[in-house]
């Protein structure tokens, strides 16, 4: 069975690739989890973030946006000293701001799914990826979404982070053409 080259790095990567990456997400909780994980990934390997994922879920109230929106200074400081956390002050302090912005956006559009797919007219983007070198780091789409999200109060949400997010939640299918997951939406 052929799979994308990056998925061969570890068991964490393979499992994530085979079961999640590029599969269409419809659940707001999952969207928020992926926004957090992609934000934490900046400057780190995705494999490292996947290894920390279970611990992050434990200390971040299972990625519950309503709970994270209420985090105060004491909670943020405790996260910075927790070994399960990715200890980057900017990333940790962006959590409650992003949670509040996420909840406001969901209230405005009815769901994050409705918001994100308005940028693609309700359609998935399926790219022609012959090999890993063909995969872009960002796109005009991720630039537009990043810009809009920043206007809405999100932090630590650049075009590269958003592109990775869009891949992860299935808005963009960047599986290599020969990968068995290419074109699978759910």
Where in the sequence are the language-model features?
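HhH-family (HhH-GPD) DNA N-glycosylase catalytic core used in base-excision repair
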Residues: 1-186
């Amino acid at each position: 069975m052929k799979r994308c080259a990056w998925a061969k790095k570890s068991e964490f990567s393979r499992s994530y690739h085979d079961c999640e990456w590029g599969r269409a997400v419809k659940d707001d909780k999952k969207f928020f989890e992926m926004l957090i994980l992609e934000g934490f990934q900046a400057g780190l390997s995705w494999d490292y973030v996947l290894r920390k994922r279970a611990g992050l879920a434990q200390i971040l109230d299972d990625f519950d946006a309503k709970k994270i929106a209420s985090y105060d200074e004491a909670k943020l400081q405790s996260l910075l000293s927790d070994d399960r956390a990715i200890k980057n002050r900017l990333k940790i302090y962006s959590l409650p701001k992003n949670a509040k912005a996420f909840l406001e956006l969901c209230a405005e559009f009815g769901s994050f799914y409705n918001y994100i797919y308005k940028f693609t007219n309700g359609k998935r983007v399926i790219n022609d990826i012959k090999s890993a070198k063909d995969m872009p780091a960002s796109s005009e789409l991720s630039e537009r979404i990043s810009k809009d999200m920043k206007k809405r109060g999100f932090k630590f949400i650049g075009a590269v982070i958003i592109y990775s997010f869009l891949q992860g939640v299935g808005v963009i299918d960047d599986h290599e053409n020969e990968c068995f997951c290419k074109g699978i939406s759910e």
